Swiss-Prot record:
Its biological purpose: Participates in the Wnt signaling pathway. Binds to DNA and acts as a repressor in the absence of ctnnb1-A and possibly ctnnb1-B, and as an activator in the presence of these proteins. Required early in development for the establishment of the dorsal body axis in response to maternal Wnt signaling.
Stated name of the protein: Transcription factor 7-like 1-C
GO cellular component terms listed in the entry, alphabetical order: beta-catenin-TCF complex; chromatin
Compositional bias annotation for Gly residues: 1-11
Quaternary structure note: Interacts with csnk1e, ctnnb1-A, ctbp-B, dact1-A and gsk3b. May interact with ase and tle4-A.
Organism, scientific name: Xenopus laevis
Biological processes annotated in GO: canonical Wnt signaling pathway; regulation of transcription by RNA polymerase II
């Protein structure tokens, strides 16, 4: 506990402390002796002084706030009452602020303890234990609500009424000295400091961090921000502005003190120390949340400017009229003949109409085409006169840019899906599809006549079943050529079929992947079945023949 040597005196407490009279049940707790008569005299003198000093106050306020006593024995009543309330355990609700952990001391004279006798020596010890409250009796009789600067700078701090109190006064601590964590409990025996010879203060863990000054504060749980809104019935100390100020008042209670207080009381009852405001009322810079200044940087401005410039350029380009290139000879011919072709044909597709126009253009003679070439030359001359600075590159570049802007997301998705298809499908068709490995199906089809040659052979391969009918269906000429090949390949020997076949037919047969159970590995006796199936091959498409054979 911080100690302060002030000019001594008889006043040991504030004039707002609570005093219990003998008729309230304290006479039984005190030791019988000489203290009773002295206490009665003290009470009478304090009442006279209070009536003289606070003539403007009402009787209720006088009863609520009796002045302090001026003799050495005056802390006994207060301390006994504090100890009784401590025993009742009705007041330990937690301190409203952590700056006053030493303001309530148990009654040292009222307890029957062998180490603390109830005689004047203990009272002298109590006076030494409260050096901060020592002041002359004449200075303690001044009005508590309007203390003079001299009184505040040198003497005891007096209790102010709540509505006269500055809201930041409870944050000002007594001293910047810290509590010694290793001192044993000092309320049992007075410990004298070997350096100064002054008795040490009691241990912080044995003291209540709250100072009960009025009966209205009994049993009330103070608000966490009660130091900002002073309430009636909860008077607080006004501390002298000079000499006792701590640079960070809420941090005056060190870690050992906070641990001792929290060990005595439950965590939800002891609020954490407030560290929000400085003594001057200005928030500390380390506590205030930093506000980042939003200064515009060059990196943030440049993209916006570039975007704006791009938008302006695009708008200017859009405002310019699109100049078409001059028509060539074929375009002039299409422009002239398109209406005739549409009238002659019932087709409405532009692609088909363009094909017809292209065939007719190539069927024209040179003389007829020369007429349109001459018209195209005149068109170019007129265009160059109208637009001298125009070039075909302008339109070409614009169109390309527009296509990239419009089709960039779609083309990306399209290419992704197309790659997926390329990855999945070739693995199925690369080996068993003749179209992928040996050219188109029209040139070298997988013939189902080989399957007809052997009834036990499968009807068609997997690739043939997967392909549409348009690829597997062949005209009658194809069927006749294949049947002729089989007729020419008829031989009683079973050595090698490709040696007796004609070279193109043998190559076409061997170049296709044929199942192992096909006609090549079958005995030659099954070939008459192929001859019997020739009328069917000539009359029906191949796809229908293969399905009927299944």
């Amino acid at each position: 506990m911080p100690q302060l040597n002030s000019g001594g005196g008889d006043e040991l407490g504030a004039n707002d402390e609570l005093i219990r009279f003998k008729d309230e049940g304290e006479q039984e707790e005190k030791s019988p002796g000489e203290g009773s008569a002295e206490d009665l005299a003290d009470v009478k003198s304090s009442l006279v002084n209070e009536s003289e000093n606070h003539s403007s106050d009402s009787d209720s306020e006088v009863e609520r706030r009796p002045p302090p006593r001026e003799t050495f024995e005056k802390p006994r009543d207060y301390l006994s009452e504090a100890f009784r309330r401590q025993q009742d355990a009705a007041f330990f609700k937690g301190p409203p602020y952590a700056g006053y952990p030493f303001l309530m001391i148990p009654d040292l004279g009222g307890i029957t303890c062998p180490m603390v006798p109830s005689h004047p020596a203990s009272r002298a010890y109590l006076q030494m234990k409260w050096p901060l409250l020592d002041s002359p009796s004449t200075a303690g009789l001044k009005d508590a609500r309007s203390p003079s600067p001299a009184h505040l700078s040198n003497k005891v701090p007096v209790v102010q009424h709540p509505h006269h109190m500055h809201p930041l006064t409870p944050l000002i601590t007594y001293s910047n000295e810290h509590f010694s964590p290793g001192t044993p409990p000092g309320h049992l025996s007075p410990e004298i400091d070997p350096k100064t010879g002054i008795p040490r203060p009691p241990h912080p863990s044995e003291l209540s961090p709250y100072y009960p000054l009025s009966p209205g504060a009994v049993g009330q749980i103070p608000h966490r921000l009660g130091w900002l809104v002073p309430q009636q019935g909860q008077p607080m100390y006004s501390i002298p502005p000079g000499g006792f100020r701590h640079p960070y008042p809420a941090l005056a209670m060190n870690a050992s003190m906070s641990s001792l207080v929290s060990s005595r009381f439950s965590p939800h009852m002891v609020p954490p120390p407030h560290h929000s405001l400085h003594t001057s009322g200005i928030p500390h810079p380390a506590i205030v949340s930093p506000i980042v200044k939003q200064e515009p940087s060059s990196g943030n401005i440049s993209p916006n400017l570039s975007r704006k410039s791009n938008v302006v350029v695009k708008k200017e380009e859009e405002k310019k009229p699109h100049i078409k290139k001059p028509l060539n000879a074929f375009m002039l011919y299409m422009k002239e003949m398109r209406a005739k072709v549409v009238a002659e044909c019932t087709l409405k597709e532009s692609a088909a109409i363009n094909q017809i126009l292209g065939r007719r253009w190539h069927s024209l003679s040179r003389e007829e085409q020369a007429k349109y070439y001459e018209l195209a030359r005149k068109e170019r001359q007129l265009h160059s006169q109208l637009y001298p600075s125009w070039s075909a590159r302008d339109n070409y570049g614009k169109k390309k840019k527009r296509k990239r802007e419009k089709q960039s997301p779609e083309m990306e998705n399209y290419t992704k899906t197309k790659k997926m298809c390329v990855q999945h499908f070739p693995s199925d068709k690369s080996c068993d599809s003749p179209a992928s490995s040996h050219g188109s199906m029209l040139d070298s089809p997988a013939t189902p006549s080989a399957a007809l040659a052997s009834p036990a052979a499968p009807a068609a391969t997997h690739s043939e079943q997967a392909q549409p009918l348009s690829l597997t269906t062949k005209p009658e000429a194809r069927a006749l050529s294949h049947s002729a090949a089989f007729l020419a390949s008829k031989s009683p020997s079973s050595s090698s079929l490709s040696g007796h076949l004609p070279s193109p037919v043998g190559a076409s047969l061997l170049s296709r992947p044929i199942p192992l159970t096909s006609s090549i590995l079958s005995p030659p006796g099954v070939f008459p079945s192929a001859l019997q199936a020739l009328p069917l091959l000539q009359a029906q498409p191949l796809s229908l023949v293969t399905r009927s054979s299944d």
